[in-house]
């Protein structure tokens, strides 16, 4: 069977879910986008899909509290996960959506690639590293997208990319690092190619877990 040809420009919003129980069936292939609340995740999604209003951009970091699903082809989805690391959010709310993030990462079998977005000026903070380490341990390919690279000179941008590559090389995992700018479209073509390659894999059938398999202990822990 030939693989599905993917065009990110065909992405269409389908649902916002508070947890994985309300997501589409765990089949096909998903690529998830995760990052700190001010990493420019929504802007990156809009740029990659050439749709200015696909992902809502909030001026208040920490507003994205749901798992947002965008379908790019039949059984091929982009997943916008809740942002993490923003302090000015009520603790109860923070725990609720960080639990949703952790459950998704641990339980979603159709997840085949993870895009971790980091401000190029402040990459690899503790939660970023935790997320990338988890992906490496799970044999999940990662695209480390260093956003807002238009804020740096070409020389500084290159040195930051090299520094991140060096820091992640010890994980011996499938991790690619790319400078990215939603404003200047820097890195758009390269990121598009990587994400589409993930989505164009052959999908496998999975045995869905029973409802009792989900427990409250599965949580992506937020630092205080």
Swiss-Prot record:
GO molecular function: GTP binding; metal ion binding
Matches recorded under Pfam families: MMR_HSR1 (PF01926)
Cofactor annotation: Mg(2+)
Residues that bind GTP: 35-42, 62-66, 80-83, 147-150, 180-182
Stored CDD domains: YihA_EngB
PROSITE patterns: G_ENGB
Residue intervals of the EngB-type G domain: 27-201
Domain of life from the UniProt record: Bacteria
NCBIfam families assigned: GTPase_YsxC
Name of the protein: Probable GTP-binding protein EngB
Organism: Colwellia psychrerythraea (strain 34H / ATCC BAA-681)
